From Swiss-Prot:
Gene3D superfamilies: 5' to 3' exonuclease, C-terminal subdomain, 5'-nuclease. This is Flap endonuclease 1. The keyword DNA repair applies. The gene is fen. GO terms for molecular function: 5'-3' exonuclease activity; 5'-flap endonuclease activity; DNA binding; magnesium ion binding. Its EC number is 3.1.-.-. Its cofactor is Mg(2+). Residues 330-338 are annotated as: Interaction with PCNA. Keywords: DNA damage, DNA repair, DNA replication, Endonuclease, Exonuclease, Hydrolase, Magnesium, Metal-binding, Nuclease.
Length: 338
């Protein structure tokens, strides 16, 4: 997912405390996908309730957002709306990848290959409509605001940061910069120790902050040229040019000025180029949202998680105690959130 331009961008590692009192517009689909990929058993099986319904995403929302809020972060979830028509090929390819990964996961499990199984299980992750509906409901009950974008969630989140309604976008993808996000924070919901693939080595994963202005200045390019570089490499809307990585794309765009000249020189073509470039520069966004963090509905959360999805009531209550202590306790605590 996204575009592979990360090696070109400046990154600063920070502690989570550095985001205290900051509003972060979180790319909901991207984050739910992360929860579904990471919150799994050793053989890759996701968390499920007694009816077989996957609950990894709900666990991530409750426990990881509670930890963020304890650290002073003010999260907003931004959900995707209708994707542009020219994203259909990418969505179809993702479906094929998931189907293939699911088959390989089942095969690896049958052979007792836990590490292989886990890898393929992660690649098989899928965010369904029911998962989104349950996620929205849980956010409402937890008192955390969410926004429904008219189209791409990253575009809406970028707009909210541009307006000053949020300080950062929270996403693992770099597409946010193509939509004009001033600042992005990565690894927000996956901070902690992570095992390296095929190695018995664990590394500390910390949040990374990236600035669009700083990266463009370092590269000596404009945002439009960054979009052109991404399109050379490949985006959610087009396949990249053969044998063109981010560094070569940067060189070509700086040398020729824009992607149209690059394509002419290479004898290549990108379908609907103008429409796709314009979509990055001028995506559909909305001002129809309200940002309020309110006291959680304890009974509602317990009903959704414990009665419907078999969560431990003791653990859920402990998480709610922590949540209420930070956004639902005294008036002075609440005042810090507005």
């Amino acid at each position: 997912m996204g575009t592979d331009i990360g090696d070109l961008l400046l990154k600063d590692t920070i502690e989570i405390a550095g985001l205290s009192n900051k509003v972060v517009a979180i790319d909901a689909y991207n984050t739910l996908y992360q929860f579904l990929s990471i919150i799994r058993q050793r053989d890759g099986t996701p968390l499920k309730d007694s009816r077989g319904q996957i609950t990894s995403h709900l666990s991530g929302i409750l426990y990881r957002l509670t930890s963020l809020i304890e650290a002073g972060v003010k999260p907003i979830f931004v959900f995707d709306g209708k994707p542009p028509d020219f994203k259909s090929d990418t969505l179809a390819k993702r479906h094929e990848v998931r189907e293939s990964a699911t088959a390989k996961w089942e095969d690896a499990k049958a052979q007792g290959l836990e590490e292989e199984a886990y890898k393929y299980a992660q690649a098989s992750s899928k965010v369904t409509r029911e998962m989104i509906d349950d996620s929205v409901r849980l956010l409402e009950l937890m008192g955390i605001p969410y926004v429904k974008a008219p189209s791409e969630g990253e575009a809406q989140a970028s707009y909210m940061v541009q307006k000053g309604d949020a300080d950062y976008i929270g996403s693992q993808d770099y597409d946010s910069f193509l939509f004009g996000a001033p600042q992005v924070v990565r690894n927000l919901t996956i901070t902690g120790k992570r095992k390296l693939p095929k190695k018995n080595i664990y590394v500390d994963v910390k949040p990374e902050v990236l600035s669009l202005v700083d990266s463009l200045g370092e590269l000596g390019i404009t945002r439009q040229q960054l979009i052109d570089i991404a399109m050379c490499v490949g985006t959610d809307y087009n396949t990249g040019l053969e044998n063109i990585g981010p560094k070569r794309a940067l060189k070509l765009v700086k040398e020729h000025g824009d992607i149209k000249v690059v394509l002419k020189e290479l004898g290549k073509d990108i379908e609907d180029l103008d429409a796709k470039r314009d979509f990055f520069m001028n995506p559909p966004v909305t001002d129809d949202y309200e940002l309020k963090w309110i006291k959680p509905d304890r009974a509602g959360v317990i009903d959704l998680l414990c009665k419907k999805h078999d969560f431990s009531e003791e653990r859920v209550n402990k998480a709610l105690d922590r949540l209420e202590a930070n956004i639902g306790g005294s008036q002075s605590t609440l005042d810090q959130w507005f």
